[in-house]
Amino acid sequence: MSSMQFGAATEFSNKCGVTLMNTPIGRVVAEVMGAKEGVELTEYPSMIRVDGVKLLSFDYDELTEALGEEFDGSIFEEISSTHYGRMVHLDDKTMLFASPEDAAEYIGFDLTAK
């Protein structure tokens, strides 16, 4: 776990992230995500920051297996609060993209339109 750094920067960070409630479910989700390459966790008494480079993918089957109980989009919404990056909800996962262009195919954004 790392410490939070505050400040302002004008360059593109290529990062995305979400704040999870520090509950039994939130903790397991954070641990699963923290084991992935490029993902950093920052723990606070009531919340856990999950930050990643380019893309965070919360796979519901993977999280269901880790929890030992069903995990879906409604539970993700329940344990998460703030986020940064483009969030896309699908039936089997929630994804956060650092760049809206990377999310274009999921959100119906035409990169070639003028």
UniProtKB/Swiss-Prot annotation:
Effector component of the propane 2-monooxygenase multicomponent enzyme system which is involved in the degradation of propane via the O2-dependent hydroxylation of propane. InterPro entries: MOase_MmoB_DmpM, mOase_MmoB_DmpM_sf. This is Propane 2-monooxygenase, effector component. It comes from the Bacteria. The propane 2-monooxygenase multicomponent enzyme system is composed of an electron transfer component and a monooxygenase component interacting with the effector protein MimD. The electron transfer component is composed of a reductase (MimB), and the monooxygenase component is formed by a large subunit (MimA) and a small subunit (MimC). Induction: By acetone. Transcriptionally activated by MimR. Belongs to the TmoD/XamoD family. One of its GO terms (molecular function) is monooxygenase activity. Gene3D superfamilies: Monooxygenase component MmoB/DmpM.
